[in-house]
Amino acid sequence: MPQHRRIHVTPVWLLIGRRSLGIVICTLSIATFVFGLAGFVWQYGSTNSVPSGSPAGGAVEPEPRQDWTIPVFKAVQLFLLNSGAEDDQGHPSNWLLMIARIAAGLLFLVVSSAVILRILDDVRRLPGVLTRRDHVVICGLGQIGLQLLDDLKNQGRVRDVVIVENNPANPWLQYAENMGAEVLIGDSTRADTLAEARVSKAAEVFVVNGDDGVNLEVVAELGNRLQNLKPSQRQTPLRVHVHIVDTNFATALRPYCSVLHDSPNMSVQVFNVLRNAAAELVTHQLWPFAPKQESEVAHFVILGFGAMGQAMAVQLAQIGSFPNLQRNRFTIADHDIKKSASPFLARYPRFTSWMDDNSGQLGVASFSPQADQWDWNKEPLPQEIKVDAPDAIQYACNAEFVELPEGRSDERFAAKLAKQFTGDGIKPIVFVCGRQDRDNFELAVQLRDQLSCQGCADVPIFVWLPRQPALAETLSRAAKEKIIPFGQCHTAAAYQEITDPLRERIGQKIQEAYEEREAEAASLKGQEYSRKKWADIPDGFRESNRVAADHMLIKLRRVGVEIVRRTTPEQKGGRFTKKFREDTRRTLAKMEHYRWVAERLLAGWRYIPKGTSDAEISEYKRRRFNHNITVFEKSEAEKDFDQIDVIYEECQKLDGFILRRASDTE
């Protein structure tokens, strides 16, 4: 996977001028004052007319007191282009004063030239600022802002970009200017800064400052600014994409996007790069190593359980439903694992089997083939959340939480992993998700060496390298090493991934197909059915469709097909029939069912026998109960087959995307 390199080239004359301007001004200022002070002291010290503090009016002092502050005052006057000297017979000039006057003149020329050039530059840009519209505003020039800038440059839209950055020392400001973007130095939470960026006339705003609180303040200020616009002043709502760094906060905030502001003239979408990176890995990079036979089981090892590790665990549990049709195994390790695992289990109590008995045991004590089966229902859960029903699926996966040794090359830890990997049908995959790129790289390399010594040289190791494209490119070139980078901004924070995500498009198609089936069923009964629009569906159900869309990519890989963005208008995809062999169709339906079960469990849903009336079923849904959270054979499988039957049909309707035969077809 080639990485994108940014070449930051500044013209030599500009580089020298900008770096030396401050030095020149400082040097001339010092020279003016020092030589001027010395010259005036020399001038008055060499004459009999030394300034004094003797009183006026004829009062006589035997010995007048010499006032040496006068030379200081005269030296300061040089900065105002006032020579301050009395060049006559009584006060002869000297070479020190000549140097000081020359330095003062040069200082005036340098400073005034810089000011005039800045004013001329502002005047030059003023017509463009006053007429700018339908442009893109990027608040924050960090990793995400840079990626957006690069993507817009590739689309030929970079001159329609305005960067708002509050740090004048940001090393990428010159890069942005060289690309042709407009750069504003200012606080994006302030109304005057947003006014200068003309956000009221913009097409899109990306709020990527790197601080969740600041980003929300920007959204609120945008709402205030657009609230009182007349309909004639804006034809379409301003599209605002706000990055929320905290994955859990982003999930909680997403349903409230419509109430983050009071303006009908803007729409807000929340995105999270960590979630994007984890989903990208599971749906695009994991398939070659995934379990594909029913005799196989995935054993995922997550090293580092911070924000990225937790996002990875959630995505693997939600959409890691493969053709093996088994629960996934997890070994999750970090320093002081209880500190991060306990809040995670509190948020996702049905992620795995566990007990809150103060024993210190988190997750499962061991792995067994019986517990890999979805019908296994004997592992414990806290009594308060356990469902007392033999048909219920209680939790999504089997996970153990262990301490990560301080030493990265701990042989005992590698030996323990190797022992777990050597069982029949085990498909181990390691994810290194620490907080620092360099530490992740070192841990991945050292663990690879340790596992090789334990006879597990073929274990793939995915390493999170979001900030070091050079390291990621190095690993990409060494594909035989089975150390694979992920999480780079050119995929997780790409412009199209944020503004037009595939999961949103497929999710809408899934919902439309569902509404079509419901309308047909109602018509057969002689009833009317009011179809719901995508925007009117509760966010929880919209997100469920999005997760189903994520998994659609894995189902397509199961039948040897992949969906990709169309890069040119002439690019053609294959045409695929919607008919599957019955055994393939059943496998895909089972994959969808257990994917749906895991997603529902993580969202807090529980099993309950089917309601006997519409009112009871509606009440169960409100309380997050569902009778289908059970094994495939005991569920209403029609819903799963319905979704499978529209895979090709719906995916081939997507504008801007094509289906094609995957390179690793079965």
What residues fall within each predicted segment?
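Amphipathic alpha-helical binding modules
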Residues: 618-656
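Short, charge- and proline-biased low-complexity linear segments
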Residues: 537, 548-557, 611-619, 646-650
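Surface-exposed intrinsically disordered loops and tails
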Residues: 375-383, 608-634
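Cytosolic regulatory regions of ion transport systems
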Residues: 1-32, 36-73, 77, 81-590, ...
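C-terminal accessory/binding modules appended to enzymatic or scaffolding proteins
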Residues: 586-622
